[in-house]
Every structure is written in C-alpha cells, then in structure tokens.
C-alpha cells in the first residue's frame, strides 16, 4: 500500500461548519479551508469545484486523483512535509479537462498599508488596491498569470467572484475577508485578460445580489451590467500640453468651453471617430475647452449621464477606456482642454450597483433623511464615512491622472451643501450645531479640491452651485470650498429672462442686466448657457428670442456677444453655436441640416468662431475676470434705450469698449463716453452682413473727440444697429 493510500481519509474533510459555509457562499476565510494545508507529516489539498466531475492534483510529474468528499468539495492527502507547488486538473461533464494553478494557495494581494490608508480615508491611489488587477507570480512550476480582485463589503456574510470563467456560478470562487478591513480578496489564475465578472454578495439583510465592481475600469455595453477586466497600454502624445498645463492658472487664462453630450453630438460616433471629428470642429470654431457631460458609465443612454453606476469606467457605448484616452489625447494635441462632469452628490438605486451594496447602507448615508435625494430618486453618499470619502476623492484623482483630464465640473453642489435641500420641513435632520449645513459634505469638497489641485497643478474644478454659499472659490486654507470657479446661475437666469422678452418691455427689466455686476467679483465665475436650458420644455436659445427669424438671429448673436464680454468664463451647449431650433433629443442628435438650409444658422456659427478668436486675442476680455479692475461701466442706466455699455480692462493696460443695443430699433447718433480720444476700431459688429445681419454699422470704426460724456474725458457718436453688440478698441 502506498503512503498516499495510507493517508486516504486523513484530515480530508474540513470541519462540518466550514463545509456548510462554503456551500452557502458565506465563508469569511475560504483560504483557511481550501488549498494546501500541513497536518504534521502530510499535506491535504482541498478544492471546491461543485460542478466538476473529476479533480486531480498534479505535483511535478505525479498525478493524485482527489476524492469527492461532498457538495463539490474534493480533497487528497499527500506524503509531503513542506508546502508544495502544484496544479489542479479539472474535468467537467462533456468537456476537455484543463489544468490551472489553485487560487487558494496564494497570499493576499493587498498589504496592511493599503488597508490602513483605506480605513482612514487617505489612500489617494485607491484604484490600484481595490478592483481587478492582472498580476503574475513566479512559482517552482513557472509563472502564474491571473487577476486579483478586491471589493469592500464589510457587512456581507460572504462574497464570491462570478463571471464567464466559471459560468457565472456563485459557488466556485469564494473570496476571503482581510481582517477587520471589510475588504474581500481573491487572486484567480488564468483569468481572461478582458474577462467579464461580478461579485455575488450575500448581504447582511439575507439578500443575495450580483454586483458590478465599484472600481471597475471597464464595463459591458449597457443595458448589460457586468464589469470587465481592463488594462491600458495607451501611449500618450500630449506631453507638451501636460507640461504647459502645470505652469498655468486657468483663472487668468481665456476659457471658452463647448459643452458636449457625446452620444448625441453626432450619433453613432466612437471615441476614436470623435477624436477626429469633434477635435476638428472645436478647433475650427476656436473654442479653448470642451466639457463632456458625464462620461462615467451610466445605465440609461437617453439621459445626460448624471446617474452614474461605475465611477471608474468611461462608458463603453463609444469604445474602450483607451479609446477615450485617444479622444482626450487628440484634443490636447490640438490645444483644447478637456473638462468632464463629475457626480459625487448622489447615485442611482439600481440593484446591481452601489446601493445597499452589502445588504446595508454602505456608500449611502444610513439616515433616510440624509441618504436619499427625493427629487431624483437616488441615494446620497455618506460623506462622513472615511472609506466613502476615499472612494470619491480617489475617483477625482483617477480621472485627472489616468485620463489626463484638465478639470472636473462638479454637479449638484447645492444639494450636497444643504441638509434640507429640496426636502419638506420634517424631512431632514440638522447638523451637530442644529444648522442646515452638511458639514461632512463641506469637508469632503474641501479635501477633494485641495488634494486634486496639489496632485495636478493647473487643473480646474468648477462647482454647479446655485445658492449664495460664501467662499465656493475661496482657497481651503482660509475656509473656502477650494473650487477654481463656479457657475453663475444668477447671471444665466436674469439674462435669459431679459432677452426672452419683447424689446418694448425690456426697459422695465433693465436691472436684470445690471444686477450681476453687484456680485460679479465675489467668486470666480463661469457664465453657463448649458444643457439645462435646452430640455424639459425650455426649448433652445433660438426659441427664447422673440420675433421673426431675422430678429431671433439678431437677438441670439447679441446675447452671445454679451456673454463673451461679461466678466467670467464662457460655456455654451452644443447646437446653440448655430442656433439649433429644436429642443435637444438624444435620439435625433443635433440638427446639422440647418447649416445647409438657412443663412441665419451659418451667421450665428460664424459669429461664435469670430468672438472666440477675438476673445482669445484680447486679454482685456479675460485676464481680469475676477477683479473689479477688469471692468468699469460706461453707462449702466440707459434703460430708456435698452442700451448697456462698459469697458473691459486687461492686465496689460489694454481696453475694450462693449456696447449692447437690446432695443428692436436702430439708435443713430448715439454718443458714448470713452477713456481716450482718437480712432476706435470696430472689432465686432454682430449686425455685420458676414453674420447674415442687416449691415448697419460704423464703417469699421469711429473717431472719439475730447468731449466729455458719461463721466469719461472723450466721446464718440455711434450707430447702434437693432438687437446688436459692438466691441471697440483703440486703433
């Protein structure tokens, strides 16, 4: 009788409770049962393969058939006194056997430092620890290639890895929890390089759910929901851009941003196709930046993308993560900055995503009065929990580092800052000081901004914050939130209300166009004419303009010139640059045919190109956006004529006079005060024939004399076309 035969039955079966937990999928330490274990003068190898017909342990050239104990557990006792290198040959009914290294013989792939930093919320490169990562280990029998998986689910009864590799069986790949960290981990040899997977989580609530990886770098194309192992081999070509970016401060640079929803800009294009077509379009029309509506994976293609289900994965609808890198790279090499919308305020309740991840409120706040956003039917992140805060801060760094993103536009900041945001009187709980401010969210935003700006000098963070919260763009070192800029929602609402009115009524609402200057320098502002203004029955900018098509076109041109002249950076949603007439549709995309059918659309598009070019070439329009020294009124009070006029001042001493006639009629012989006498060149006239206007103007310029007017030492007499803007500079 061989020594192996003598050992048959020795220690083969684990403790009954261990086997029961394995079968139930709720064992916290399957590695303590499975794999190779020393028992005095012999070793027992156990493998859990519930659907296998036969399992053989291979040691060197020797083969040892394993005994089926019960419920898919196989075991064999071997006469060795030291842990050995071995493989498993596994056979299933009606299939060829295959040989693989045993997943349960490998040490944890996360170290104590990773787990400690995560528990404290300070792991800035958390995506390198959690999620799915291809790895290789050198053994006596050669190199073992595979993928390590790690997921945070501290309250789960058990977690298993499922995927194509095991026929989506929840029993063959149980994971182990690493100490008290709540992180479950498993290295699986020979896992496919781009394999699909999920985690089967036995929740604390008794519910078994199949979950996408919160740290997945890639996903299936929706509506499928599996995560995909993803490795980047992209070679960047934007080194010059990245070097120069680190030396710049966007607050003091020109920023004219084209806001894009990738799926509907030109439907059907991939990231690689967009890298050519979108880049060429943006360059041709002289924008400095693009802002992409949320690129992170989201379940509903017909949405803007603000309900994110995979925060670390660019949507797979348009290609792979490396394809998205190619888009960013192409834009950078063309001199275009890339901002992405980022959504840390809330997340959807899809049962396969983050919500109730381990059967308890994990990523979301446990108090329903803080953990749910009623308006949107979503969960709200628990900003006070270190691991959740770490998940989000690391995510911001991930997009900036891994995709060379130049900025994050943070969505729905107001909903984060106020505990009573859009809640009934009895639907919220106060903070520790009995106030309505969400102190944990404030701390999170400060940490995110400080960390991002330290890690990547030259990037921009922009808040969509619709209230008067003080210090949104103040540095965190003096108590601010630390954003670079915030959207000026007040300017947007007042301006659109004004220009939507018939000109004969505008004089009664003149204050709507002057009020913004009372607070224009209280924060660093972006002036948004965004996607929010072209949905839900709001129509389009074109549709808001009163009158005939000729009048609408003139009104839109003057509005855009006013936006570009006003202190603040510019943002314009796609389609508005050529006066799209129909409201946005994710199915139809933009109405590019308008450029073939009417001169008004071409005129507006030509104007946008020209004002972008003029804007970038004249620092008076951008270098002092955030300081009163960059702006002075000529006349803020000519409501009778519906005229506004002001000067923009550059940090180099340059000046631009900006005059707006929002009346529906021409003003001839209009005297305007100017800072110096002499020739003033007409830099822009929105009524010019090249913009399909009527051609009324000043023949390219005016001569200012030393006649004081409007409190200025000089003045000139101008012709102001109806619904127009004029920009003048000293010749």
UniProtKB/Swiss-Prot annotation:
Pathway: Glycan biosynthesis; glycogen biosynthesis. The active site is at 411 (nucleophile), 464 (proton donor). It comes from the Bacteria. Gene3D superfamilies: Glycosidases, Golgi alpha-mannosidase II, Immunoglobulins. SMART domains: Aamy. GO terms for molecular function: 1,4-alpha-glucan branching enzyme activity; cation binding; hydrolase activity, hydrolyzing O-glycosyl compounds. Keywords: Carbohydrate metabolism, Glycogen biosynthesis, Glycogen metabolism, Glycosyltransferase, Transferase. The keyword Transferase applies. GO terms for biological process: glycogen biosynthetic process. Coiled coil: none annotated. Its EC number is 2.4.1.18. It is an enzyme of class 2 (transferase). CDD domains: AmyAc_Glg_BE, E_set_GBE_prok_N. Disulfide bonds: none annotated. It catalyses: Transfers a segment of a (1->4)-alpha-D-glucan chain to a primary hydroxy group in a similar glucan chain. PANTHER family: 1,4-ALPHA-GLUCAN-BRANCHING ENZYME. Catalyzes the formation of the alpha-1,6-glucosidic linkages in glycogen by scission of a 1,4-alpha-linked oligosaccharide from growing alpha-1,4-glucan chains and the subsequent attachment of the oligosaccharide to the alpha-1,6 position. Monomer. This is 1,4-alpha-glucan branching enzyme GlgB. It comes from Mycobacterium ulcerans (strain Agy99). The gene is glgB.
């Amino acid at each position: 009788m061989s020594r192996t035969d003598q050992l048959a039955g020795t220690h083969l079966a684990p403790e009954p409770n261990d086997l029961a937990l394995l079968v139930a999928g709720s064992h916290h330490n399957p590695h303590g049962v499975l794999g190779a274990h020393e028992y005095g003068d012999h070793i027992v190898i156990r493998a859990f393969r519930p659907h296998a017909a036969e399992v053989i342990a291979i040691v060197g050239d020797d083969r040892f058939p394993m005994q089926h104990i019960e419920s898919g557990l196989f075991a064999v006792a071997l006469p060795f006194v030291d842990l050995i290198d071995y493989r498993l040959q596994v056979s299933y009914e009606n299939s060829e056997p295959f040989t693989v290294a045993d997943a349960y013989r490998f040490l944890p792939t996360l170290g104590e430092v990773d787990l400690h930093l995560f528990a404290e919320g300070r792991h800035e490169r958390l995506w390198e620890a959690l999620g799915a990562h291809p790895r290789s280990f050198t053994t006596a029998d050669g190199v073992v290639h595979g993928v390590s998986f790690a997921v945070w689910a501290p309250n789960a009864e058990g977690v298993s890895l499922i995927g194509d590799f095991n026929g989506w069986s929840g029993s063959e790949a149980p994971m182990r929890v690493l100490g008290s960290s709540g992180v479950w981990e498993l290295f699986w040899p020979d896992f496919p390089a781009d394999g699909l997977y999920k985690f089967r989580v036995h929740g604390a609530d008794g519910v078994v759910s199949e979950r996408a990886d919160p740290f997945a770098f890639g996903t299936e194309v929706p509506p499928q929901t599996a995560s995909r192992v993803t490795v980047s081999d992209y070679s960047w070509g934007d080194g010059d851009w990245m070097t120069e970016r680190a030396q710049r401060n966007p607050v003091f640079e020109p920023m004219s941003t084209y806001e894009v929803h990738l799926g509907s800009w030109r439907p059907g294009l991939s990231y690689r196709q967009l890298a050519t077509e979108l880049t060429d379009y943006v360059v041709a029309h002289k924008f400095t930046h693009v802002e992409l509506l949320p690129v992170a994976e989201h379940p509903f293609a017909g949405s803007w993308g603000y309900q994110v289900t995979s925060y670390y994965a660019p949507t797979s609808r348009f290609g792979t993560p490396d394809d998205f890198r190619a888009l960013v790279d192409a834009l950078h090499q063309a001199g275009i900055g890339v901002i992405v919308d980022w959504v840390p305020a809330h997340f959807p309740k899809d049962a396969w995503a983050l919500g109730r991840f381990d059967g308890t409120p994990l990523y979301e706040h446990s108090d329903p009065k803080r953990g749910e956003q009623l308006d949107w039917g979503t969960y709200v992140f628990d900003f006070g929990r270190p691991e959740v805060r770490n998940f989000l801060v690391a995510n911001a760094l991930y997009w900036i580092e891994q995709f060379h993103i130049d900025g994050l536009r943070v969505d729905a900041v107001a909903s984060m800052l106020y505990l009573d945001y859009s809640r009934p009187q009895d639907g919220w709980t106060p903070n520790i000081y009995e106030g309505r401010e969400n102190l944990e969210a404030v701390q999170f935003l400060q940490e995110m901004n400080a960390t991002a700006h330290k890690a990547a000098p030259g990037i921009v963070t922009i808040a969509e914050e619709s209230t008067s919260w003080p210090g949104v763009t103040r540095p965190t070192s003096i108590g601010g939130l630390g954003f670079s800029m915030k959207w000026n929602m007040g300017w947007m609402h007042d301006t659109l209300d004004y220009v939507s009115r018939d000109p004969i009524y505008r004089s009664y609402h003149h204050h709507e166009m002057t009020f913004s200057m009372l607070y224009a320098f209280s924060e660093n502002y972006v002036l948004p004419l965004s996607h929010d203004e072209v949905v839900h029955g709001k129509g389009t900018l074109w549709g808001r303009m009163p009158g005939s098509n000729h009048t609408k076109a003139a009104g839109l041109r003057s509005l855009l010139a006013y936006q570009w002249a006003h202190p603040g950076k510019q943002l314009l949603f796609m389609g508005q640059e050529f006066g799209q007439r129909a409201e946005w549709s994710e199915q139809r995309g933009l109405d590019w045919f308008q450029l073939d059918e009417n001169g008004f659309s071409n005129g507006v598009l030509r104007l946008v190109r020209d004002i972008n070019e003029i804007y970038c070439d004249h620092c008076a329009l951008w270098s002092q956006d955030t300081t009163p020294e960059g702006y002075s009124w000529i006349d803020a009070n000519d409501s009778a004529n519906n005229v506004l006029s002001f000067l923009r001042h550059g940090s180099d001493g340059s000046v631009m006079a900006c005059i707006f006639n929002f009346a529906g009629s021409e003003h001839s012989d209009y005297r305007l005060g100017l800072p110096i006498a002499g020739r003033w060149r007409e830099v822009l006239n929105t009524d010019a024939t090249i913009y399909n206007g009527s051609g009324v103007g000043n023949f390219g310029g005016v001569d200012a004399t030393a006649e004081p007017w409007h409190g200025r030492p000089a003045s000139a007499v101008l012709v102001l076309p109806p619904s127009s803007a004029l920009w003048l500079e000293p010749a």
